[in-house]
Amino acid sequence: MPGDKGRATRARMVQTAGVLFRRQGYDGTGVQELLDRSGAPRGSFYFHFPGGKQELAVAAVADSAMGIAKGIEVMLEAHDDPGQAVGAVVDLIAADLERSDFRGGCPIAAVTHDTAARSDEVRAACRTAFEHWQGLLEARLRRAGWSLAAARQEALVILAAIEGGITLGRAARDTEALAAVARRCRSTLGSAAPAVG
């Protein structure tokens, strides 16, 4: 069992992997670059991740997903109106994308694109992350009076729109797509739950 220093080294590698995956994907990130950027000792990678880069990816996906979830939760709780709450989440994501000079996308999507066809463990970690975020959106809509089925479907549509907006934003180097998603959320979610669903 690693001591405090070992846990700190492992945590640095996981966090660094999340940043690198976000900017350059799983395939574009090498172990040596990870060690160099994290400042981890050369022999420490396989000590902490005997399953190799895939094991690291599972840990980095979980870590990144939890960090993003915390930001989502803060925004969802900051507004009484669900449309304003979800719009604020999208605004936060757009600001983060712009701050990264459109180099940083969703770390979970980046890893999914690179690994889904070849690693069930990494794919499962990515799916869990997306399902968690969808669950946060769904729970917020449920608190606003949406039925379970309607909230679940709307949360899935919102998540898909956000992920698509990030991709379009990186390609166009602007936040127009995400701004459109935020506007749509604000205008269609509103404070009233849908009549059917």
Over which residues does each language-model region extend?
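Amphipathic alpha-helical segments used for helix-helix packing
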Residues: 57, 84-88, 99-124
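Hydrophobic alpha-helical connector segments
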Residues: 73-104, 155-158
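Amphipathic C-terminal alpha-helical segment
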Residues: 96-99, 117, 139, 159-177, ...
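N-terminal intrinsically disordered/low-complexity leader segments
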Residues: 1-8, 193-197
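Hydrophobic alpha-helical segments that form the core
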Residues: 109, 148-168, 180, 184-188
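All-alpha amphipathic helical-bundle segments outside canonical DNA-binding/catalytic cores
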Residues: 84, 124-125, 143-159, 173-176
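Helix-turn-helix
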Residues: 12, 16-59
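Hydrophobic alpha-helical bundle segments that form small-molecule/ligand-binding pockets
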Residues: 79, 118-120, 130-155, 192-197
